[in-house]
Amino acid sequence: MKKNFFKTAIVGLASIALLAGCGGQSSSGNNSTSEKSGEKQVLEFYHGYHHSESEWPVAKVMRDLYDKFAKEHANGNVEFKPIPVNGDLKDIMKNKVASGEFPDVIDLAGNAVSLAAIEQQLVLDLKPFIDENNLQKNVGLNYEQNQKDGKIYTVHEQLFTMGLWYNKEIFAKAGAKTPDQWKTWSDFTEAMAAVRKVDGVYAYGTGEPSIRLFNTLLGMSEAGRKLLSGPLTKEAIESKEFSEALRMVMTELQVNGSKNAGGDANAYSKDFAEGKSAVFFNGVWASGEMAKNPNLQPGIYPGGVAISSSGGGITISSKMSEEKQKLALEFLKYMTSDEVQKIIFEKVGANPSDANINVKEIAEKSTDATTKLLGQAISQVKEAKSIVPTISDVWGGDVHTAIINALTESAAENVNIEQKVKATQDILKSLIN
């Protein structure tokens, strides 16, 4: 789903436009004048795929999918109108919510659901429709991760799926264990120590990507995974699992050094492509560029941990006529259909939400190098010992940013790790109060 394999998911999703929102019960109130007068109604769908085909081919693929749905329903009483937005879709959402409304249909592009929209009951609960139409497998991870208090307010048709990428040639030169051999955290740190000894090579770039290691350590234990299953609390922050994860990541980052700390994954993409670093923390969407160099291979994190989140996606207003709501739900069904989900995998280059799609089988039969590598990367994630959601998806952007800042700062040689762990815990406790 990304414009550039070097982009992190956060940057990539921002390029598709950031937004948020959701909540509520079905209602036919607040109909427009045209709806009341019998004129053809318009169902507006806001999305961020505004880019030209030459700038980002994926955007054209997505627009074609939307246009196909519009044509298939052109003879109905409701016109489906996709609206590409070159800007921040959050502004559209915020303005609507401020006036007690919500866009007819909007793609959250991975962003969290608006609590204000939930509280005002502005967004439709999608779970009844999903259950009635047996779409549980089609929506996949969304059914579990996006279900809050028995309701599902948003469904993302493609998943934010993270493993990592490594240069097998560098690992061979270093005699280091490859990711498939990282049974413990020590296996990982020892491999990184080995690749640092190769002339002209550093292990990995940190900064924003460092939070993937914290995410991983929590995912390696049952207690840590339990922390990732709910809101961040004072007790969670003070827990042994949380503090130990901070301590272990900070210690490793300090060994890795401050020279390659700071920024997002984009800051280290060029070095990885040129063989100057051994590991690149990025998602499965990177397959397109990785396929150009056979030395660059996908892997998952220590202890067989992978990271995958549904995040926000198709979100529907609860304040529409029954006809508009019906078409909106048909659009949800269409975007999570096997036919469309196969295109999401093969043409968009993303991990489809639909559990019915056998990406491994499709990849093995394909002659396309990118599809083959993408299938390999996604299959590794699906077969991981543990799959955990992202920190930002579970605990929000503020906590996500605070942890990244703390981890980045810990890379400096003069930082006292124990003091940094305590200071980070204090900052996080102040954020949740």
List where the protein language model places each region:
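Extracytoplasmic "Venus flytrap"/periplasmic binding protein-like
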Residues: 72-138, 173-175, 269-271, 278-279, ...
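C-terminal capping/gating helix-and-loop segments adjacent to ligand/active sites or protein-protein/ligand interfaces
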Residues: 372-428
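Extracytoplasmic/periplasmic solute-binding protein
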Residues: 149-157, 162, 172, 186-234, ...
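Conserved N-terminal structural module of periplasmic/extracytoplasmic solute-binding proteins
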Residues: 4-16, 22-113, 323, 327, ...
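Periplasmic-binding protein-like
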Residues: 213, 295-316, 366
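Hinge/lid segment of periplasmic solute-binding proteins
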Residues: 109-162, 189, 197-199, 295-299, ...
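Glycine-centered hinge/linker elements that transmit conformational signals in sensory
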Residues: 190-194, 232-261
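Mature extracytoplasmic/periplasmic domains
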Residues: 37, 114, 122-123, 288, ...
